[in-house]
Structure formats: structure tokens, C-alpha cells
Amino acid sequence: MTDRTLKKVTKRKNGVIPMEQNVLTNMYETLGISKKVLDFAAEIEEHLKTRFQEIDERAEFNQLKVIHAMQECRVSDIHFAATTGYGYNDLGRDTLEEVYAHVFHTESALVRPQLMSGTHALHVALSGNLRPGDELLSPVGKPYDTLEEVIGIRDSVGSLKEYGISYRQVDLLPDGTFDYENIAKAVNEKTKLVTIQRSKGYDPRPTFSVKQIGELIAFIKKIKPEVICMVDNCYGEFVETIEPTDVGADMIVGSLIKNPGDS
């Protein structure tokens, strides 16, 4: 249906309509959506315009950041060739990981199909950095349910607990903020790695901003500078203009089917 046809339909029903009438409004009316509803929606959109603009600008900034990383890593058509999965000289995989390291300002990155999920990536990060006798600390309360078997909160073959790695957690305060007093008490000579879950997951607590995470990391590093601070960044990638690795995180872990995969 052309713009002209829409104007003719409206003219027959409602009388003479100026040529500049919005064809989108005509279509809504054709679908039975009243002007009252449209005006109400327009009022709400106008009220939220500034917020929507902030989100659009942030998304554009992060898109440009990724494009810049691809340019710096000289990504071209040769990097999109099929792969056999053989580990040596996989130019596409190696360059993809270089792009990720550039985007998140890290020394290196692991981005490959052998990592089946975010939980798998977290398991690799934890088991690769913890040894028997070490202790894992969560200063943000209980982690995702899927990590309970990885850590050993629930019994599971191959858990960190089975390998002699202990776990300690400090719950958040009732208002959802960090319990700095008890975090300071929990950090001890065995504490090797601190895991910070950015997303609220299934708990009714706030999701942490990069600024909040940076403050927590600075507090912990002041107590024990050599401790590894890892952030579970799932759902957090690209929602701000900076990432946890920009504020002191030693390592971040995420899922490719969330923000980076644009699902």
C-alpha cells in the first residue's frame, strides 16, 4: 500500500486530510489504535528521550571501540576462512582473541568454541588459577546456581572442593551494598582469588556498576595486593563505556550468547 493509497483511505473515512499527514499515524489508525493511545505513547517517549539518547550514544561508542580494535588488529577477509579446529596457525581464532584483548584492555584472551558456556569459562578460569590449599572468596554473596557444583557448595565430581580448594563468602548488607567490615575479616593468607559476580543473577539485589566494582577491588587489593580479582561480567559487557578490567580487575569472564553475541 503506497502513501497515496493511505491518504485516499483516510480521506474517504474522515474527510479532507492535509497532504503532510504522517503516514505512520494513518497506519496505526488503520489498525484500530486510537490517537489517544498514540499521544500517550508520544508523551512517554518524549519523557524518556534523554535516557534513550544516552543508551544510543553508549552503544555507538562501544561499537566504534570494537571497530577500532578490529582495525588495530588488521582484521580482513582472510580471518573468516573455515577452521578445522586444529590448534596451530588458526589465524582467525588468534586474531579474534587479539581483538577481544584490545577491546577489554587485557594482556590476552581466550575466545574459542572449546568453551561451551559462561559456566564452563568460569570453571576454566577458577581451576586454572587455584591450587590445593588455596581459598576462593566471594564478597558479593552466593554465586549463580550453576557454579555451586563447580565450587563444591553442592557435591560434584571434579569440584574445586574435591581438589582441596576451600570457599568462603561474605553476604551483602540488607541494602545490597558491600559489607566491607566482614570482607576485610574474610581475606586471609589462603585467599588466592576473589570472584565478583556483576549481575544480580537470580537474587533480588542490585547489579553492580563498574565504579562500584572498582571500589571493591581497590579495597581488597589494599588488604592483599597479590590476590587475583576476577569479575563474572556476564550481561555486563558494553553496558558502560568502561569495563571491570579498566578499574583493576585482573580477569573478566563472560558468555558469548549474551551481550558480545548480540542475542
Which positions does each model-derived feature cover?
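A short glycine/serine-rich beta->alpha loop
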Residues: E107-V111, S255-K258
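N-terminal low-complexity/disordered regulatory or targeting extensions
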Residues: A59-E60
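Conserved PLP-enzyme active-site core in the AAT-like
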Residues: E20-A42, K49, D56, V66-I67, ...
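N-terminal amphipathic/basic-hydrophobic helices that include classical n-h-c signal peptides
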Residues: M1-P18, Q197
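Active-site-flanking structural segment that lines cofactor/substrate pockets
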Residues: F80-L110
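Compositionally biased, low-complexity repeat tracts
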Residues: K8-K11, Y28, A81
